[in-house]
């Protein structure tokens, strides 16, 4: 929440300085929220956004693998595919688009790790967080289901877009990659949606979705060779449910434990270091 303060003196009319106040912490359990249409509208928005996210991105992955398959035939076989760079752009670009579209309705989480991090920071209630995560997981399953329905000839052959630990990497390496990648994403979410920044940059509505989308893009470039890049438990679960192969399920815990740890670290770092909530613990004083 922000308020305008009119400038006075010779600079009046040229600009308005913006002050801001931090919103109050969300209640842990808000039963009254269950009676409000705005909650269910937000849950629907999260479901649809995650469905669209998984449909576009997994379809891109399947299409790329088909186009680069040396044994494939048909007109698509002559195409070199979008490459890892194109896959990263598909994930980052869709997050940018969907966060921009849904931020004013649900906050544009589209990711249980983001929701979990915001819950730990008391930005959303437990009720809202649980409903969001359920909607995100169901949306992801439906989105991947659409891909399988439209690309049934290629879906299973090319791995179903499922996240799996690549050969040559240990489970510890995969877990660390997911922790660090999710930390980058959730840290960016906190920074881009910080009340102080929002008050200053509210006249440019794309400034929050843009860095979040870029964070997803950059993390994919770094971690696609290791885990296929999860950083989103709903994305990993949706692909595993529809693909339903042992390898995808054996590695599934990496794509839940890693992102949730990364989100928790990012929430603590933002709240107690960058935003100086540590002053409540009496450790130091900040004018930030």
From Swiss-Prot:
<protein>
    <recommendedName>
        <fullName>Aquaporin PIP2-4</fullName>
    </recommendedName>
</protein>
<feature type="transmembrane region" description="Helical; Name=5">
    <location>
        <begin position="206"/>
        <end position="226"/>
    </location>
</feature>
<dbReference type="GO" id="GO:0016020">
    <property type="term" value="C:membrane"/>
</dbReference>
<feature type="transmembrane region" description="Helical; Name=2">
    <location>
        <begin position="79"/>
        <end position="99"/>
    </location>
</feature>
<dbReference type="InterPro" id="IPR000425">
    <property type="entry name" value="MIP"/>
</dbReference>
<keyword id="KW-0813">Transport</keyword>
<keyword id="KW-1133">Transmembrane helix</keyword>
<dbReference type="GO" id="GO:0005886">
    <property type="term" value="C:plasma membrane"/>
</dbReference>
<comment type="subunit">
    <text>Homomers. May interact with PIP1-2 to form heteromers.</text>
</comment>
<keyword id="KW-0812">Transmembrane</keyword>
<dbReference type="Pfam" id="PF00230">
    <property type="entry name" value="MIP"/>
</dbReference>
<feature type="transmembrane region" description="Helical; Name=3">
    <location>
        <begin position="130"/>
        <end position="150"/>
    </location>
</feature>
<dbReference type="InterPro" id="IPR034294">
    <property type="entry name" value="Aquaporin_transptr"/>
</dbReference>
<dbReference type="InterPro" id="IPR022357">
    <property type="entry name" value="MIP_CS"/>
</dbReference>
<comment type="function">
    <text>Water channel required to facilitate the transport of water across cell membrane. Active as homomers. Increased activity when heteromerization with PIP1-2.</text>
</comment>
<dbReference type="InterPro" id="IPR023271">
    <property type="entry name" value="Aquaporin-like"/>
</dbReference>
<feature type="short sequence motif" description="NPA 2">
    <location>
        <begin position="232"/>
        <end position="234"/>
    </location>
</feature>
<keyword id="KW-0677">Repeat</keyword>
<feature type="transmembrane region" description="Helical; Name=1">
    <location>
        <begin position="42"/>
        <end position="62"/>
    </location>
</feature>
<feature type="region of interest" description="Disordered">
    <location>
        <begin position="1"/>
        <end position="24"/>
    </location>
</feature>
<keyword id="KW-0472">Membrane</keyword>
<keyword id="KW-1003">Cell membrane</keyword>
<dbReference type="GO" id="GO:0015250">
    <property type="term" value="F:water channel activity"/>
</dbReference>
<feature type="transmembrane region" description="Helical; Name=4">
    <location>
        <begin position="172"/>
        <end position="192"/>
    </location>
</feature>
<comment type="similarity">
    <text>Belongs to the MIP/aquaporin (TC 1.A.8) family. PIP (TC 1.A.8.11) subfamily.</text>
</comment>
<feature type="short sequence motif" description="NPA 1">
    <location>
        <begin position="111"/>
        <end position="113"/>
    </location>
</feature>
<feature type="transmembrane region" description="Helical; Name=6">
    <location>
        <begin position="254"/>
        <end position="274"/>
    </location>
</feature>
